A protein has these predicted regions:
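Detector for small/aliphatic-rich hydrophobic stretches
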Residues: 1-87, 98-104
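Short alpha-helix boundary/capping motifs
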Residues: 68, 115-116, 151
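Short, solvent-exposed loop/turn segments at secondary-structure boundaries
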Residues: 145-149
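Substrate-engagement module of ASCE P-loop NTPases
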Residues: 153-156
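Conserved inter-motif catalytic segment of the P-loop NTP-binding fold
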Residues: 61, 81-144
Length: 156
């Protein structure tokens, strides 16, 4: 068991090396590179935007929940910044008529026929690391296919 002198020396050493710990302040962590969505409230909630090269799950409760509007706003913002958005469309359901031609020019649209195909495609794209923003849309995929997705698949 350490004596009082050793404890005092340890505290002094830690205070010199980690002054923020003494003040009850957590060390500042470096934030991952983020890509702004163009929606101020969302960017603030996410600490600057979506993590670049990462995976973020957005869940929409159903029809009319705003997921298409979110995707359109994200695409417009990405295009305005001169970047590309990669959309893995799990049910080949994107309404391209609703998008502006300028935004479409910055969209890599991968049309899939099944949930499994969409997941494999997304996995390959995320491993590549050359694509800054990948969106996987499974909203219209059949529920029985979605229930077969293993929970561990989402961890990176």
């Amino acid at each position: 068991m350490p004596n009082d002198t050793q404890i005092i020396e340890l505290r002094r050493f830690l205070a010199e090396r980690l002054p923020q710990a003494r003040l009850g302040i957590a060390p500042r962590r470096t934030a991952p590179d983020t890509l702004a969505t163009g929606i101020e409230a969302v960017d603030q909630a996410l600490g600057g935007g979506l993590p670049k090269g990462g995976f973020t799950e957005l869940v929409a409760p159903g029809e009319g929940s705003g997921s298409a509007q979110f995707l359109h706003a994200l695409l417009r913002h990405t295009a305005a910044a001169g970047r590309f958005l990669t959309l893995v469309d799990g049910a080949d359901s994107l309404d391209v008529d609703a998008l502006e031609p300028e935004a479409l020019a910055h969209l890599l649209w991968i049309r899939c026929r099944s949930t499994a195909e969409a997941l494999q495609t997304t996995d390959l794209l995320l491993r590549d690391r050359n694509i800054a923003l990948v969106v996987l849309d499974l909203k219209l995929n059949p529920a029985h296919e979605l229930r077969r997705i293993q929970g561990t698949l989402w961890y990176r």
